[in-house]
């Protein structure tokens, strides 16, 4: 099944939908995922592929493309021909001007349209953002400014007519007036006709991610391709339907679920940065000083989940540990130097596999720095959240679209 990915970044959603990557054992509910896992080593299992394949990706960040292609080169031929380094506005304009065309027979369109203008951490300008798709600031908001780029995702859906589309954004969108309702209405008005269920806020920790990360997910299902009887049942029963597209929890406090993954579990096997002889991503971490009472200047709770990993500069990367003088509470690590989370630690917290290189060729052409890596990791959809969606969709696919 072919996936067209928009606002792809370093490919968290792409990788998740596809499967075929390593995940920490504490992050996987082996009872629910039994047919999708195979042993790898004492820390990791291998998640089998779901049947989805990314055939088009795009982003405006050069280092996002570098990281994406560097990882996906082991999964596809010529990944640089799949990933298009241009904005969604330029992509659509080039399609309409017949400069190039999308791949045929797209099954799924997915996109995490820019969230800065809807997030609690940002300025919450929403639809009134004056920054455009290439970062240029205008006097008045337009359809090409960040807060309205979901309309260009809508255009891509109208062009490609997939069976399913998935749109993702921050939880803050839900509390920003009637923004969620407006977006849902616009998605429901797509030319070819889609059933768009009420958007759901999913917390990544309920899917094995050792992080408290809430995201609002919109899912649309094509009326053209779906079985009418099954679709009518879905509309009527909503979450009680056997083809409800939002994935069930795998982790939580319910005794039938696996307990939430903790930072101690997913980070315990890592050496300290100075001892990480080959992994540049574990060697690299922000040296920014502690600034009390500002965002990101707290110590993570190793016995729980990390706060949301953000796509911001080094001074907002949480501390792996604080010193005793600065209020450090991680008793087993107080003898070690105070430091912030490494790039690798942030990546594992986001559930990226340990073989995904984020810092490479430093100081050379086509390099990705630690600063760039922090940014693309913080912008990403956690792969395990994407996998939960992809696995569940693959399981209900035939029933949804059988004729």
Swiss-Prot record:
It comes from the Bacteria. It catalyses: a 2'-deoxycytidine in DNA + S-adenosyl-L-methionine = a 5-methyl-2'-deoxycytidine in DNA + S-adenosyl-L-homocysteine + H(+). Its EC number is 2.1.1.37. The active site is at 115. One of its GO terms (biological process) is methylation. Pfam families: DNA_methylase. InterPro entries: C5-Methyltransferase, C5_DNA_meth_AS, C5_MeTfrase, C5_meth_CS, SAM-dependent_MTases_sf. Residues 1-400 form the SAM-dependent MTase C5-type domain. GO terms for molecular function: DNA (cytosine-5-)-methyltransferase activity; DNA binding. Keywords: DNA-binding, Methyltransferase, Restriction system, S-adenosyl-L-methionine, Transferase. PROSITE patterns: C5_MTASE_1, C5_MTASE_2, SAM_MT_C5. Belongs to the class I-like SAM-binding methyltransferase superfamily. C5-methyltransferase family. This is Type II methyltransferase M.BepI.
